């Protein structure tokens, strides 16, 4: 989610070199919605889910019926550790650092406006960069389970810090079917399955350790595999590749210039992201599922 005070194309607020922020800065910040406002070419799942920042333009999260406060960083891995997964940019904020940032600056600001933590849902969806980077640096014949365990261990140690602040409702989303994507030929279905199984085991353990918490695990992998299996029912024309002109300023009005049909007819936005249309489809399923929980 792009913010007016964020690093362009990467974040809602700040970066590794601008790590701290004041409540005044956070509340003057606005969600930016346009072609480059997300990594999907349009609204993403948290914007669709909350209804906050869906329309083009600038949006104040406090004026949304469901407020959206996004502290994720584009291109982030879970762990910032030399020799494990590479830092994509020197300004990248890893998940561990994102949560440090939230604990130190985000939560105090939200407490200052009396955010009702009993009505807050903490959502965590990470792992695409982790699994891709591990196979890129170690090779597809490596044994990845220990690395996946390490990642999940660090995720939930960080989530523990959010729990300690008084948040009790958590949503975790597993990896999508990267094995069927255009940019990840080295990532196979067994890797994705292993990563997701280890993730689920850690989420279950977190639930068992905290009886006062509600842990929700959304299986987006199954949802999107089903969409891919029946893609024509959703209006998709291309589910194996992405439009090479996806990030061009005139792509929405002239996709044919790049040899493409409309972006909404593509499942994949680029080698590592789903289109906004795919996010919209999965979020409809997610919303119905959440209501039943």
Which residues make up each language-model segment?
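Conserved active-site regions of diverse hydrolases
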Residues: 1-293
């Amino acid at each position: 989610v792009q913010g007016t005070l964020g690093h362009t194309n990467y974040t809602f607020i700040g970066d590794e070199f601008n790590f701290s922020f004041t409540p005044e800065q956070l509340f003057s910040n606005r969600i930016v919605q346009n072609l480059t406002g997300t990594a999907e070419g349009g609204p993403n799942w948290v914007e669709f889910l909350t209804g906050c920042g869906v329309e083009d333009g600038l949006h104040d999260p406090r004026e949304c019926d469901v407020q959206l406060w996004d502290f994720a960083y584009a291109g982030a891995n879970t762990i910032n550790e030399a020799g494990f997964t590479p830092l994509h940019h020197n300004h990248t904020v890893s998940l561990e650092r994102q949560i440090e940032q939230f604990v130190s600056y985000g939560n105090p600001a939200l407490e200052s406006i009396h955010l009702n933590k009993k009505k807050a849902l903490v959502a965590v969806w990470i792992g695409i960069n982790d699994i891709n980077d591990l196979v890129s640096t170690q090779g597809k014949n490596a044994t990845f389970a220990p690395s996946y365990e390490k990642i999940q261990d660090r995720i939930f140690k960080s989530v523990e810090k959010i729990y300690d602040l008084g948040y009790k409702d958590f949503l975790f989303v597993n990896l999508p079917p990267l094995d069927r994507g255009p940019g990840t030929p080295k990532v196979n279905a067994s890797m994705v399955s292993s990563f997701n199984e280890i993730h689920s085991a850690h989420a279950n353990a977190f639930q068992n350790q905290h009886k006062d918490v509600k842990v929700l695990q959304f299986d987006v992998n199954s949802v999107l595999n089903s969409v891919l299996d029946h893609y024509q029912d959703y209006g998709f024309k291309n589910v194996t590749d992405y439009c090479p002109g996806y990030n061009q300023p005139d792509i929405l009005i002239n996709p044919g210039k790049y040899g493409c049909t409309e972006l909404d007819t593509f499942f994949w936005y680029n080698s590592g992201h789903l289109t906004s249309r795919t996010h919209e489809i999965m979020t409809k399923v997610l919303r119905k599922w959440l209501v039943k929980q």
